[in-house]
């Protein structure tokens, strides 16, 4: 995808960030300041990057701030996935592209384990399963419904990690296994049977959630009262509610 300003949700230490060569600017967002400090150390002080420590349920951006977003290896930590997706939609323009990865509960391994009575939760029920604290697997049908309800239209799906089984990793050469995995991923538009699924989505309508006629500037907004903020280090003070947000080491 190509565009002006990408929002990388759950950016962590910036491992994936260099891959997004099609965007002029990238805002890395993560709940962990420590992770963002690692990303900053890796990516440097380039004006192309902005580093924001924030809560995905209260994104600190104006409506329609970005024309692209990614959320990879992140949704599975969300106890309220629809609320998180709604926030993502709010900050995207009408022509944006959204890349989402989710953990699929209805995968072959979980179905076999359920059949053999080695797990007590069903991979077929629509509700998420919390297999560890704040670690969720989701049913594909639930993801499709949530995406539609929050204003996204799924364009393509790719399944990955089909062969996440110990004996296969030991018995089959890594290169061959990766090739077979990429081949199997082409069936993603037909069925989701792998533990991890990538989705490319567009917007259901071609306008932001709230009309925004400006370009995707990545503009900041107070997460408490939604007033627009000026990026004025070393402290950003909200003109609406008076809250102050610290700018520390970039």
Question: Which residues are covered by each model-predicted region?
Answer:
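Conserved class I S-adenosyl-L-methionine
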Residues: 98-122
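A C-terminal cap/extension of S-adenosyl-L-methionine-dependent methyltransferases
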Residues: 117-120, 145, 155-220
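Short cysteine-rich clusters marking metal-coordination/redox-active sites
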Residues: 222-225, 238
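A conserved beta-strand element that flanks and buttresses the S-adenosyl-L-methionine
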Residues: 70
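A short glycine-rich, Lys/Arg-flanked "PGG" loop and its adjoining helix->strand segment in the class I
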Residues: 82-97
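Acceptor-substrate binding/catalytic loop of class I
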Residues: 121-142
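Class I SAM-dependent methyltransferase SAM/SAH-binding core
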Residues: 7, 11-58
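Short catalytic micro-motifs in class I SAM-dependent methyltransferases
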Residues: 73-77
């Amino acid at each position: 995808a190509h565009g002006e300003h990408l929002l990388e949700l759950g950016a962590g230490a910036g491992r994936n960030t260099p891959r997004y060569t099609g965007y002029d600017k990238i805002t890395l967002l993560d709940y962990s300041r420590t992770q963002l400090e690692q990303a900053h150390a890796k990516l440097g002080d380039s004006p192309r990057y902005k580093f924001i420590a924030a809560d995905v349920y209260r994104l600190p951006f104006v409506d329609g701030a970005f024309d692209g977003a990614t959320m990879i290896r992140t949704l599975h930590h969300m106890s309220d996935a629809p609320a998180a997706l709604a926030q993502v939609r709010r900050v995207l323009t009408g022509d944006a592209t959204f890349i989402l990865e989710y953990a699929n509960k209805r995968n072959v391994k979980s179905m076999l384990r359920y059949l053999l009575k080695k797990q007590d939760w069903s991979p077929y029920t629509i509700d998420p399963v919390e297999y560890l604290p704040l670690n969720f697997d989701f049913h594909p049908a639930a993801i499709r419904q949530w995406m539609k309800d929050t204003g996204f239209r799924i364009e393509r799906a790719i399944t990955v990690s089909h062969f996440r089984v110990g004996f296969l990793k030991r018995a089959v050469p890594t290169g061959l296994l990766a090739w077979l995995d990429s081949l199997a991923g082409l069936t993603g538009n037909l069925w989701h049977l792998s533990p991890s699924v990538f989705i490319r989505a567009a917007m259901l309508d071609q306008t932001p959630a709230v009309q925004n006629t400006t370009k995707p500037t990545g503009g900041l907004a107070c997460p408490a009262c939604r007033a627009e903020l000026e990026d004025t280090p070393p402290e950003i003070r909200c003109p609406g509610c008076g809250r102050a947000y610290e700018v520390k080491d970039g």
